[in-house]
Each structure stands twice: as structure tokens, then as C-alpha cells.
Design a protein with these regions (language model features):
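Divalent-metal (Mg2+/Mn2+/Ca2+)-assisted nucleotide/phosphate chemistry catalytic cores
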Residues: 74-153
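General beta-strand structural signal in soluble alpha/beta enzymes
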Residues: 25-27, 60-64, 105, 123-128, ...
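Active-site glycine-rich loop that binds ribose-phosphate moieties when present
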Residues: 106-108, 137-150, 154-175, 208-213
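Glycine-rich nucleotide/cofactor/substrate-binding loop typically near the N-terminus or early
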Residues: 29, 34-36, 42-97, 220-236, ...
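A C-terminal functional module that forms or caps the active site or interfaces directly
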Residues: 225-288
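Solvent-exposed alpha-helices and their adjacent loops that cap or buttress functional pockets
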Residues: 16-19, 24-25, 54, 115-118, ...
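Anionic-ligand binding region
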Residues: 195-220
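N- or domain-start disorder-to-order transition segments that initiate the globular core
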Residues: 1-21
């Protein structure tokens, strides 16, 4: 463990929270570097961090900078991540290389889970998890996020899986891997920009306290892997299912025609969707992350009270 700590650097705020046993909530950084244009990405990141504070927890945005896994970013780190043109998108397979080469890296859902677990952080807020891509039966394009959820003990609060994915297959994969997917005040898997996907959930809860109970019980039973808390985008910010599906289908065709696949597919598709919705999808994306941040903080606080 001593060697591991050589690679981890805590922000002042996060270090203080650790010393005071305050609840901490992790945030990913790919949404900053690859998910949104500047300066909206910085505004979104600072707003989301503040929402977590307002709900009683401490935010820890995670990124790789100069050979260090940063747990919590100072404002200068955030600027580097938001404006640098050479930020690598880091998943599990890339983590050692990016750290060793002292490059700047933004963490995906999978890597944020890994780094959060290294730092003893049990909760992580994101927009949407990755999953099984459309046509995966031919391409085998399945996000490493799903595999990570099966083995890393972090509870992930999200608005379901990104709506560009094959959601029924994503749920089948999570079921095979034994990952609980729990709807928050919903019986249907939310689909990122929309509240409905047509995919029913077997588990649903009404309060953060109930989620805290489940999280702690799972830990005490030594069950390996994470939990997905599926928190739908608020009604007033949701886009209609038919509208967004038509746009996604157009974007998928464009990606195929241009030969864009693998880790480049998601940023390309999300960028195209922003363009085709005239920015409506970007506004929805920001609102759903803010909504997840509030819930994530409430769950972390509820768990802290039970310890």
C-alpha cells in the first residue's frame, strides 16, 4: 500500500475531509475534457462540486496529472484539464501507462471507480455509465465500465446508461455480472437524456436512506462489485424519447460512415447530438449530472450517519 500512496495526491479539501471522516463523493473528469466544450465544462464542474457541498458531502474530482492520480482538483488542475488539447481518455488498460508517462489523463467511469476505491471513496457521481454498443454482436464493443462494476466496490449514481447504447443488452450484461441496478423513484431504466427506455427494473427505492442501507449491507456481506443507482433526469429537463432516438440513429450512421469506433465513438456521438439538438442535449446533460450530484451526496451523508 505504501507504493500505491506514492501515486495518489489529495487536494487540500479532500485531505481535510479524510482527516475529519466527512463523506466524500468522487466525480469523473472525462465529462470535463471530452464531454463538453470550454468554458461550459469548467462551469459545470464547479457547479456540480458545489451541489455536493451544499448537500453535506465533499467532492473529489479525479484525474491524472504529471504522474499523479489526483483525488480532488485544485482550480489550476481543473483549468489544465478543461483547456489542454492533449488530454488522454483513460480507462483501466491505459491507467499505468498514462501515470508512468506523466501525461494528462481524464478518467472514465471505470478508472474513476478504480481510483476512488484506491482512495477509500465509496460513492461516485456521473452522467451515465458506458455499456454495450449497438451492433456489439458483430463488433464486441462493450464498455470497460460494465466489467469494472462487476468487481470494484463503488456505488455509482447515474442517469442510467448513455442513450446511444443498446440498453436491453447493457442490462443483460449487468445481470450476468451480478451488478444490482436500483431505480431511484422509478421502475424503469432511465436513458440519460430521457426518463424512459422501455427497460423495466426489478428493484426500486424511494429514499437515499434506503440506498444507504443496501450499500452497507452489500459491504457487510462481502459481495464484490459496485451498485448502479439509476436516477432519472428531472421531468422539466428531459427530452422526448422519440426525438432523441431519431437524432441518435442519424449520429450512429454518420459514425459508421466515417469509420469512428471504440473509445472515440462516444465523444463523437455526444458531439453530434449536441449539434443536432441545437445544444438542448448539452443543457439536459448538465442538469442530469447536477441531479445525480445532489442524490450522491445525500446517500454518502446517510451512510456516514450509520457508521
Amino acid at each position: 500500500m505504501a507504493n500505491l500512496q506514492n501515486y495518489i495526491e489529495y487536494s487540500r479539501e479532500v485531505q481535510q475531509a479524510r482527516e475529519n471522516n466527512q463523506p466524500i463523493v468522487a466525480l469523473e473528469s472525462t465529462i470535463i475534457s471530452h464531454g463538453m466544450p470550454y468554458p461550459q465544462n469548467v462551469e459545470m464542474a464547479t457547479t456540480v462540486e458545489q451541489i455536493i457541498r451544499n448537500n453535506g458531502a465533499i467532492p473529489a474530482t479525479i484525474a491524472i496529472i504529471d504522474g499523479k492520480i489526483k483525488i480532488g482538483l485544485e482550480s489550476e488542475d481543473l483549468e489544465i484539464l478543461a483547456t489542454n488539447k492533449d488530454v488522454a481518455k483513460v480507462s483501466r488498460r491505459d491507467l499505468a501507462e498514462i501515470v508512468a508517462m506523466k501525461r494528462i489523463g481524464a478518467t472514465t467511469v471505470a478508472t474513476t471507480m478504480i481510483c476512488a476505491a484506491m482512495a477509500g471513496i465509496q460513492f461516485f457521481v456521473t452522467g451515465g455509465i458506458g455499456g454495450v454498443h449497438k451492433g456489439a454482436e458483430h463488433t464486441m464493443d462493450i464498455s470497460a465500465d460494465l466489467e469494472e462494476l462487476s468487481k470494484t466496490n463503488v456505488t455509482v449514481i447515474c442517469a442510467g446508461a448513455k442513450s446511444i447504447l443498446d440498453l436491453p443488452k447493457t442490462m443483460e450484461y449487468l445481470e450476468t455480472k451480478g451488478v444490482p441496478v436500483i431505480g431511484y423513484q422509478t421502475n424503469e431504466l432511465p436513458a440519460f437524456f430521457t426518463r424512459e427506455s422501455g427497460v423495466k427494473l426489478t428493484s426500486s427505492v424511494e429514499t437515499p436512506e434506503r440506498l444507504a442501507d443496501i450499500h452497507l449491507t452489500k459491504q457487510q456481506l462481502n459481495l464484490e462489485g459496485g451498485i448502479v443507482v439509476a436516477n432519472p433526469i428531472p421531468y422539466e429537463h428531459a427530452l422526448s424519447k422519440a426525438y432523441i432516438e431519431a437524432i441518435i440513429n442519424e449520429a450512429v450512421v454518420e459514425a459508421e460512415n466515417q469509420g469512428i469506433k471504440g473509445k472515440d465513438a462516444t465523444p463523437f456521438l455526444l458531439g453530434k447530438i449536441v449539434e443536432k439538438t441545437n445544444g438542448k442535449s448539452l443543457a439536459a446533460n448538465i442538469k442530469l449530472v447536477e441531479n445525480n450530484a445532489a442524490l450522491g451526496a445525500k446517500i454518502a451523508v446517510a451512510v456516514n450517519k450509520l457508521l
